């Protein structure tokens, strides 16, 4: 499941292989296989209402697709203005109080564990405080990191800390599927049959993985 890049190039100070402007962004957002506008890193452009940035945000709104954020140290009026522009998530939250402020303003916080940034230990109390607004994610995850687990690693850590099973599973699966309007994970008629089979609801060791109804992993290969 993919989104449309919002900042290509990431800054005006680099030479990129391509430029995705607001017109191209709008065209990409019309595609059914692209589900959101990704990581609006240009928060100065949002706060200063840069015309090109705002056209990209408006294109996502017109397409009915959510807009991912990137504003780690945001607070106060600037954070409120950023959210009011239509940006609904942030995966760059580092501090618990910042996470609480974002949730109080209606934002969804993605708790991140990656090869570089690891924020679970700081942010996990949000699971209990705002279960409807929390999601798990990875970011810049190297193969060696993924060999030790993906979202399931955060699920296990949460359960070891005593969090409610259904709040944890909600952050791992239900909340993301609902927020990004992804037709998977519910096993409803017409949805893609994408699911995993685990040994039990405590260890959550993956025994099999199914994608579109086909077993792609059976515990051995």
Task: Describe each model-derived feature in a short phrase.
Residues 39-97, 113-117:
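Divalent metal-binding pocket/active-site signature
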Residues 1-66:
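Divalent-metal coordination cores built from histidine and acidic residues
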Residues 146-162, 166-221:
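Active-site microenvironment of metallo-dependent hydrolases
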Residues 91-92, 110-117, 130-149, 190:
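Short acidic/histidine-rich active-site segments
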């Amino acid at each position: 499941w993919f989104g449309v890049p919002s900042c290509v190039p990431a800054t005006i100070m680099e030479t990129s292989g391509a430029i995705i402007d607001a017109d191209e962004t709008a065209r990409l957002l019309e595609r059914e296989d692209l589900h959101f506008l990704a990581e609006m890193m240009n928060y100065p452009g949002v706060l200063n209402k840069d015309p090109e940035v705002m056209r990209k945000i408006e294109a996502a709104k017109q397409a009915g697709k959510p807009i991912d954020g990137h504003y780690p140290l945001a607070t106060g009026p600037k954070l409120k203005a950023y959210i009011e522009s239509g940006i609904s998530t942030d995966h760059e939250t580092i501090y618990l109080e910042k996470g609480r402020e974002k949730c109080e303003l209606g934002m969804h916080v993605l708790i991140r564990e990656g090869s570089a940034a690891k924020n679970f230990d700081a942010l996990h109390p949000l699971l209990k405080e705002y279960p409807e607004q929390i999601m798990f994610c990875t970011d810049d995850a190297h193969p060696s990191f993924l060999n030790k687990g993906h979202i399931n690693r955060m699920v296990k850590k949460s359960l070891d800390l005593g969090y409610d099973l259904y709040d944890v599973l909600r952050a791992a699966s239900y909340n993301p599927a609902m927020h990004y309007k992804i037709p998977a994970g519910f096993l409803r008629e017409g949805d893609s049959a994408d699911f995993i089979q685990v040994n039990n609801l405590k260890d959550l060791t993956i025994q099999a993985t199914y994608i579109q109804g086909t077993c792609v992993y059976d515990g051995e290969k």
